[in-house]
Design a protein with these regions (language model features):
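Beta-loop-alpha module in the N-terminal Rossmann-like domain of NAD(P)-dependent dehydrogenases
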Residues: 73-81, 101-104
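Structural beta-strand/beta-sheet cores of well-ordered domains, especially the beta-sheet scaffolds
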Residues: 7-12, 66-68, 93, 113-115
C-alpha cells in the first residue's frame, strides 16, 4: 500500500481476515498503521475513525471498482466468480502479493479477458530482492540510503518485468 501510494496510486480498499474497508478518498496509511501495528486492532476500526469510510464484514472486496487489484493475503482468495466481478467492474491489472491467491481457473480467465496478470513469483520478487540487497550491505559492511536501495530494487523489478513480459 505504501509503495502504491508513493508511486501515485490511490488505494481505496483494504481487507483483513474479517472484512474490508472502503475509503473513496483514499486509504490513510498512517491511520491503518496505528490501528494494525500500534493498537493491534482490526481493520474495521478505520471506518469508525475516518468520515466517509465504510466497513463490510466478510469477503467481497472485489465488488469495489478498481483499475488494479492486489490480492495479498489468502491462498485461492480469487476464484472464477470473483475475477468475473473484478472484470465487470473495470479491473485491468492483477498483481499477486501472496502465495497463490488466484486459482488456476481464475488466472486463465483473467488472461483470456485481457487483464494483465502478474504472478506472485514475479510480483513478490521485490521483497526477496530487498532481503538480498540487505544481505549484500551486511556482508560488505555497507550502508545504503533508502533511495539507493529503492533505485537498485527498481532496476531489479524492471528486469523481472521485462523477462515476464517476454515469456
Amino acid at each position: 500500500v505504501e509503495k502504491a501510494a508513493e508511486l501515485g496510486g490511490k488505494v481505496v480498499a483494504m481487507c483483513d481476515s474479517n472484512g474490508y474497508i472502503y475509503d473513496p478518498e483514499g486509504i490513510k496509511l498512517d491511520i491503518v498503521k496505528d490501528i494494525k501495528e500500534v493498537k493491534r486492532g482490526r481493520i474495521k476500526e478505520y471506518a469508525d475513525r475516518v468520515e466517509g469510510a465504510t466497513y463490510t464484514e466478510g469477503k467481497g472486496i472485489w465488488n469495489i471498482k478498481c483499475d488494479i487489484y492486489l490480492p495479498c493475503a489468502t491462498q485461492n482468495e480469487l476464484d472464477l466468480d470473483a475475477v468475473k466481478i473484478l472484470i465487470a467492474n473495470g479491473c485491468k491489472y492483477v498483481a499477486e502479493g501472496a502465495n497463490m491467491p488466484t486459482t488456476r481457473e481464475a488466472t486463465d480467465y483473467l488472461m483470456a479477458n485481457g487483464v494483465t496478470f502478474m504472478p506472485g513469483k514475479a510480483a513478490n520478487a521485490g521483497g526477496v530482492a530487498t532481503s538480498a540487497l540487505e544481505m549484500c550491505q551486511n556482508s560488505a559492511r555497507l550502508s545504503w540510503t533508502a533511495e539507493e536501495v529503492d533505485t537498485k530494487l527498481h532496476q531489479i523489478m524492471v528486469d523481472i518485468f521485462n523477462k515476464v513480459d517476454d515469456a
